[in-house]
């Protein structure tokens, strides 16, 4: 499990020394040694590796990593570029981007371009056993990612949260910074996207907020590979 550095290490490094994290580390290590677990161990903290704390301008909160082969790589909603099947929730995100900003729908689900621009693509649980959704919930990741969210909440600059679905919206009480914008909608899953995710216009709203506050907006267009 590749650790954090830079501003992230300063902000949440103390978590690694807490008893809950020792238990979490032992659990995850045992899972990797006895089962297939996603993402690959070196990718667990990619959300923070790709998006330094002082560069975060948007946080999109997911739940579990994808649990099928060749999908998860440490960024919420994103899949590896070699994965040609775009997950249904991400297909719906692309549809909303197309309707909201006119973005072309790409042939891949690799969202690193967003992460490189300051979009923190964070899951609340950072590992999962293959083909067993939610299998690593309740073992400590939630405490750790709460510390990540708290570190973002403390940033003294404009930041946008996109919270889709009730689990993501359960974090709202933690988000107390008046300089930040909270956007909520149903989850983009096919089960709920038609209840208000489609038409939420979160991507244009985020960019308008960033521009109003002198922050470079996000180029949401993912290019074909």
What are the roles of these predicted feature ranges?
Residues 5-9:
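Short, contiguous pre-domain boundary segments
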Residues 2, 14-163, 167-170, 175, ...:
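A polyanion-binding, active-site-adjacent surface
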């Amino acid at each position: 499990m590749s650790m954090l550095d830079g501003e992230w290490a300063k902000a949440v490094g103390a978590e690694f020394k807490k008893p809950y994290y020792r238990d979490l580390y032992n659990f995850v290590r045992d899972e990797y040694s006895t089962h297939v677990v996603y993402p690959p161990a070196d990718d667990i903290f990619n959300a923070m590796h790709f998006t330094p704390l002082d560069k975060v301008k948007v946080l999109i909160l997911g739940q579990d990593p994808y649990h099928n082969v060749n999908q998860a790589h440490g960024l919420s909603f994103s899949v590896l570029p070699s994965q040609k099947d775009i997950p249904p929730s991400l297909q719906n995100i692309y549809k909303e981007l197309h309707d909201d900003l006119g973005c072309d729908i790409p042939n891949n689900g690799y969202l690193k371009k967003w992460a490189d621009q300051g979009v923190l693509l964070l899951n609340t649980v950072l590992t999962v056993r293959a083909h067993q959704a939610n299998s690593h919930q309740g073992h400590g990741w939630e405490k750790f990612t709460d510390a990540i969210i708290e570190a973002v909440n403390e940033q003294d600059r404009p930041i946008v949260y996109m919270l889709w679905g009730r689990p993501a919206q359960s974090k709202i009480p933690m988000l107390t910074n008046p300089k930040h914008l909270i956007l909520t909608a149903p989850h983009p899953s096919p089960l709920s996207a038609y209840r208000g995710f489609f038409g939420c216009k979160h991507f244009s709203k985020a960019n308008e907020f960033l521009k109003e506050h002198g922050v470079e907006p996000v180029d949401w267009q993912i290019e074909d590979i």
